[in-house]
């Protein structure tokens, strides 16, 4: 009798409802804002023989390397091993490949995608001038020892944002959602006329936060 073979890989459990949000965010950043234009998104129906794979998202990185986030589904939750969804995060280089944590995946993604503070921002902050750039991926810095320059720029960036309380906050929310509705209407009308508007640069909340990864 032939023995059964077990396939063991490190995975991170993900609530099922988060998987759809992950796919939507990747497609939005790839096709709408173009922040992830070079990223390859492979849905389940294009994966091929790996029926347990829900999707593959491949991030080309600097040099001859890339990061792959592979989502799995139908992983025997009835036996108590895993929830029905999980992801595997793998870093491939020329010489080796290894599984990495979501925190390190954020660092790798931030090294190639999403803007950060430029070198001249410290001088602008000292002179009291307005910052011309910002960090669109702050989650990637949380596992690193931040420099004093970075901490100072974060404080300046936060102080530049207006503080809203009480009725002012409610009014801002109403204006915000009204602006989103107007933007969607303008986008549809421009699309009907055959022109494509440019979307603003997006903030990426981080792999673990988007997927609500469970340890």
UniProtKB/Swiss-Prot annotation:
Protein name, UniProt field: Virion infectivity factor
Region (Multimerization): 154-167
Phosphoserine, modified sites: 147
Gene responsible for this protein: vif
Lipid bilayer topology: Peripheral membrane protein
Signal peptide extent: none
Family: Belongs to the primate lentivirus group Vif protein family.
GO terms under biological process: viral life cycle
Modified residues (Phosphothreonine): 98
């Amino acid at each position: 009798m032939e023995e059964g073979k077990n396939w063991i890989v490190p995975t991170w459990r993900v609530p099922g409802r988060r998987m759809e949000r992950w796919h939507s965010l990747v497609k939005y950043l790839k096709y709408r804002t173009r922040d992830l234009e070079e990223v390859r998104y492979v849905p389940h129906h294009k994966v091929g023989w790996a029926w347990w794979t829900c999707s593959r998202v491949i991030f080309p990185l600097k040099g001859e390397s890339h990061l792959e986030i592979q989502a799995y589904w139908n992983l025997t939750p009835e036996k108590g091993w895993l929830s029905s969804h999980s992801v595997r995060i793998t870093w491939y280089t020329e010489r080796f490949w290894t599984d990495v944590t979501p925190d390190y995946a954020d660092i790798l993604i931030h090294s190639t995608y999403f803007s950060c503070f430029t070198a001249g921002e410290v001088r602008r902050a000292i002179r009291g001038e307005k910052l011309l750039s910002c960090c669109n991926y702050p989650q990637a810095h949380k596992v690193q020892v931040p420099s004093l320059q970075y901490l100072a720029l974060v404080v300046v960036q936060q102080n530049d944002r207006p503080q809203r309380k009480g009725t002012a906050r409610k009014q801002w929310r109403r204006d915000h959602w009204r602006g989103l509705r107007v933007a969607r209407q303008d986008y549809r009308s421009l699309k009907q006329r055959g022109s494509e508007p440019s979307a603003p640069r997006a903030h990426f909340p981080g792999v673990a936060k988007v997927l609500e990864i469970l340890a």
